[in-house]
Amino acid sequence: MENRFFKKIVGGTNEYERTPIPAESLKGRKSFLGMYAGEHTAGTEFVIGPLFVAHGVTASDLILGLLIGNLLAVLSWGLITGPIATSKRLTLYYQLERIAGKNLVRWYNLVNALMFCFLAGSMIAVSATAVGIPFDLEMPTLSDWLPRTPGWIVTVLVMGAVITLVAIQGYNQVSKFANIMSPWMILIFIAAAIVGLAQLGVRSAESLISVAQEVIWNGVPLAGMSKFTIWHIIFFSWFCNMAMHIGMSDLTILRYAKSWKYGFYTFVGVYLGHFVAWIASGILYAVFLQANSGSQEFAPGQIAYQTLGIAGAVCVVIAGWTTANPTIYRAGLALQGIFPKVPTWKITAIVGGITSLAACFPALVMKLLDFVALYGLLLMPMGAVIFADFYFSENGLPARRSIEFEIGFQLACFAELGIDSGFLFGIKSALRGGNFLPRTPRLVCGCCHFRNCVQNEVSDL
């Protein structure tokens, strides 16, 4: 009975985990416009926008930093990830397995899946802050690491179960859900900004500039928070999705695209989500701080509800949902690379359970900026290996892929990963929080892979 129920849900889902996407399964532009708009106009926006306010960024630094950083992110998706995805039409995980060997990629896939679980978990927690409003749940604060009440745990687990139910149905359902929800959420964010500005006393263009500079983004961090500058904003907006574009995780999504140019459609997500929505949620947080002076409570649901009422709370629920859905889907595909004989939907269901448990801990939300930086630092190096392998082979340098020589553990790739990660964390430690400096190590990693290819080619002469 139970198996029949799940078979009915997942149907004949085929996610092509180890084969190229056939032509009849390719998706048009609408699918990607909706999914990226939904994913990036989502739960993280209700966290990141307020955290910029808390870190004391100025209004001018925020606007200019977001314009530059988001442009760099779109170019990374369009010029790096898109061409590789539509050329190979394979998942990130299977491509890495072919290059680096099954045994090495198993460890990478495990780390990748855990990172995705934690990110999706933070979004489930964001949704739970809104679901808990009618039940008067005690909400987490900026310093909380552990859940405060059993009610919070129950709310999170229920949200996680519902979100997982959509994710196990595969890419089609994930994309369909985002297409339905994203237009409404975008309008809610815009409405939030307008209503919030009115509550802060904005009546004209002059008062808008004054309120933005003196009330919302006044350049003064909250107690216990570090100071952010324009460089933090540029590099964070560029690299907050580094694992997706430079780290190549979105090969898994863009392999369905009819054209490599669909990678540029991410502009809909990043400029609506990582520009409009971050600004709007920052305005909401400023309204919340004005009404609750000195409050350390940090609950996106409460923040949105105070300004927009029920519509704001519902938007937070849906926003967390539209981010968690594709993230759990990606995590399921990562683990499917470790357990290739297990159906993806079963693995995704297990991932959803792990994610829901992780979501019970508010620290995932409170430390989201740090987590996103760590997430990118850990997952980016293997993207450099795929990038180097693709472009070197395209330019006549034969690639030494593990699958061709039946190598289970490509030592050179492991060394590249170790050198790159060590260099990254060395910089981060030396600068005490320099989380946005991964470009140089990516070059180091690519050069290491190039050297390995040349060395192997010479040894065959």
Q: What are these model-predicted stretches?
A:
Residues 54-56, 83, 99, 107, ...:
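Membrane-water interface regions at transmembrane-helix termini and the short interhelical loops
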Residues 384-461:
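C-terminal membrane-solvent junction of multi-pass transporters and transport-like membrane proteins
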Residues 1-61, 196, 218, 222-235, ...:
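Membrane-interface "cap" regions at the ends of multi-pass membrane proteins
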Residues 158-210, 264-270, 371-384, 441-446:
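Membrane-interface loop-to-helix entry segments
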Residues 67-100, 109-124, 288, 454-460:
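Juxtamembrane transmembrane-helix boundary signature
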Residues 124, 128-133, 186-220, 235, ...:
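Hydrophobic alpha-helical segments and their helix-loop junctions in multi-pass secondary transporters
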Residues 105-144, 321-337:
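Hydrophobic transmembrane alpha-helices that form the core helical bundles
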Residues 36, 109, 137-169, 183-193, ...:
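Transmembrane alpha-helical segments of multi-pass small-molecule transport proteins
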